[in-house]
Amino acid sequence: MAALFADDPRCGSASGGNGAAWRVICATQVLGIVGRRMILYFLDLVGVAVFAVSGVLAARSRGVDLLGVLVIAAITAIGGGTLRDLLLNRYPIFWITDAQYLTVIIASALLTVGYVRVRPPPGNALLVADAFGLALFALSGAQVAEAAQCPPIIVVLMGTMTGVAGGVLRDVITAQVPLILRRDIYATAAIVGVAFYLLLQAFGLQRSQAFGGGMVVVVALRLLAIRWGLHCC
């Protein structure tokens, strides 16, 4: 780990007292960064799993076979992120270099298929699963755009697109009217959530805290819209 901050002049020599103190501080900062990245990576995988579940539930209503279910689950889960990476010229595409994404998609899809054979899901299960997937992907997409040093308006756009594109592809493939084209509060929830995430950072909150705040806004808006039938117009 020393190599990560060996060039920092504040860390001094290993034998100096001040150098040792700075090394402890630097090590703590590095561990904090690694920890935050691991948490965000885990949340990204959770988002993939949730969107894969929503893809299975949508495919189930169309009576497709198991291969079709897996394809729809995968397109739903990675469609938005793939489009984001292409537009940001971010290569290789995130799921090509990390097999964990496809593993999570397949496992989530198969578990969901097995579950719905035993117990039919609640009527709003697809919408609720989609709400959590939308929140996770919108915020993770925003962070990718931030890392690419995009201006705030592009961060909002990329976050929203990452969140909604997979669901749009899912609905088109299963011959449904995409949620983004209905009167429901959908893309609006992603836009407001990502904007709130940026606003929290502007007020001095850490990125991980702002991430949580943005997620809460997206999920809350979607669940309120589902529960009370709220519309944009």
Where are these regions (language model features)?
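Small-residue-rich segments of transmembrane alpha-helices in multi-pass membrane proteins
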Residues: A73-G79, A129-Q143, M161, I185-L198
